[in-house]
Amino acid sequence: VVGLPLGRVIGLLIGWRMTFAIIAVVATIIFVYLLLTLPQLPSRGSFTVRKMPLLLKNRVLLGIFIMSVLFATSHYTGYGYIEPFLGQVAGMSNEAVTATLILFGASGMLGSWLFSRYYPRNRYRFIGLMASGIAMLLLLLRLSALSVVTVVVLCVLWGLISTAFNVAFQDCTIRYAPADATAVAMSIYSGIFNLGIGTGAFIGGLVCTYSSIANIGYAGGMVAVLTLVYCCCRFFRNMRKADKASTTTC
């Protein structure tokens, strides 16, 4: 919620190198604190490395990982360069950019609330709406920059949807992973998501270098469309099979 805008403010005041230096110091302090305060807990699972191929044969989990890397790639293709986009393409002042980034982050709390309220009622519809929403918003990013009001509204919706989508897939990972492999599945999910972050930043950088920063939304939107197509054509089908098998077993 506050990390990106706070980092931006620090960068504007004393330089971007100090932003990363402060992040390193804070991260080190947190690491030492956790190392000294958290107790060692014995493993409660019986998962071993030999079981990894069986975990990856879980079609729903594999689909979650595929969608997660596609989602993170599409999201960070645009979000990784949203600050210069708002300044150069939308023509916003430094203060307005900072305020928009704060709203972007804060809207994620609303996304978490919507998840808790509506996701349990219909998981398929919720995931489908989030997947289609992120694709639509990214494709409309450049058009929304014609007005400060529309680009701010789009950023708020974008922050809301991206948080809700991410939380939903964390739930799916826990729901469909074997009981003794939940921690491993979540670790893979985290690694896959970070791979998507790096891939998205790389694609966004290529767009900025060889095309225009104004087109980052189109690039991210095309990846998001792939996410939506995979979701509707393959992922939901595997989810329904797993849910049906679980119900039959019970």
Regions inferred by a protein language model and the residue ranges of each:
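Structural signature of the two symmetry-related core transmembrane helices
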Residues: 24, 125-140, 221
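Intracellular juxtamembrane helix-capping segments at the cytosolic ends
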Residues: 164-178
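A membrane-interface helix-boundary motif in multi-pass transporters
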Residues: 12-24, 206-225
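Extracytoplasmic gate region of multi-pass secondary transporters
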Residues: 60-101, 106
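Helix-loop-helix hairpin linking two adjacent transmembrane segments in secondary transporters
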Residues: 1-36
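A late C-terminal transmembrane helix in Major Facilitator Superfamily
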Residues: 176-213, 220
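Helix-to-loop junctions at the C-terminal end of transmembrane segments
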Residues: 110-123, 208
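Juxtamembrane intracellular "pre-TM" segments in multi-pass secondary transporters
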Residues: 37-65
